[in-house]
Amino acid sequence: MIKKEKNLFDLLSEKPWDQEQSAQDNLHSGKTINLTKAHLGLRGIMTVSIIFFSLFIVTYADRMLLHDWQKMPEPKLLWFNTFVLFLSSILFHRAKNRSDLQEFKEVKNLLLIIGFFAIIFFIGQSIAWKQLMEQGYFFNSNIANSYFYLFTTLHVLHLFGGLFFLKRITQNIFDRNSKLLTMQSGVKLCGIYWHFLFLVWLVLFGLMINS
């Protein structure tokens, strides 16, 4: 029996809970969605984060048009932090490729370096906050300052969560009893999240230095 191809309208109008629909699905020749709980969880986290940051960006863009907006100086250290995230993203891309080749000895070293870079970013961000406060730019002194501290703090919290999962993945790789697919999937997913955080930082950083 020749299986039927489904178009977009068919997919949107189908009723998978109906018995007749179930019989029709058996004739479907397309690929089914096969995502692990980790994949679905990551997609959920990224979706919520995108919505969350987008709402703040919209309010930021509206608020900066008012007369009481006072632009604050951007610490030069933020450029260094951006470079650190850029290097981390490159290293994660290499770690993913080495993981696919099952070269986990190099993957271990790369993940340790990435974790070290994350700590460097945290330290750099703390120093940047300290420099601004020493100059009198406190959280509640101006609305622009409030948004800066809010954006950077939210990003740090997201990166801290990424560092937690990076720690778990690194432990799995050092554990010789871990399954191959588990290790490869962990490196891939954590890498995707790291790239996502880098892109979010670029958007936030670009917005802050141009407003």
Language model feature labels by segment:
Residues M1-S211:
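...captures the hydrophobic TM-helix bundle architecture rather than a specific catalytic motif
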